[in-house]
């Protein structure tokens, strides 16, 4: 899951799919 939940990185599933990383 995504440990860093931010506005453009939620929900966790989207975070994983987008490859989002903490700033």
UniProtKB/Swiss-Prot annotation:
Main location class: secreted
Organ and tissue specificity: Expressed by the venom duct. Is present in all duct parts with a highest content in part 2 (proximal of the venom bulb) and then decreases in concentration toward the end of the duct.
PTM (free text): The C-terminal amidation is described in Ref.1 and PubMed:23031820, but not in PubMed:22709442 and PubMed:36235146. Ju et al. (2022) describe a disulfide connectivity (C55-C61; C56-C69; C66-C68) that differs for the usual one.
Keywords, in A-Z order: Amidation, Disulfide bond, Neurotoxin, Secreted, Toxin
A GO CC term assigned to this protein in UniProt: extracellular region
Disulfide feature: 2-10, 5-15, 9-20
Keyword Secreted included in the entry's annotation: yes
Molecular function as annotated in GO: toxin activity
Modified sites of kind Proline amide: 23
Localization (cell): Secreted
Record remark: domains: The cysteine framework is VI/VII (C-C-CC-C-C).
General remark: Shows a very weak inhibition on Nav1.4 and Nav1.8 sodium channels.
Function according to Swiss-Prot or TrEMBL: Causes convulsions mice.
Entry protein name: Textile convulsant peptide
């Amino acid at each position: 899951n995504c440990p860093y939940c931010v506005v453009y990185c939620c929900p966790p599933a989207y975070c994983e799919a987008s490859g989002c990383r903490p700033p």
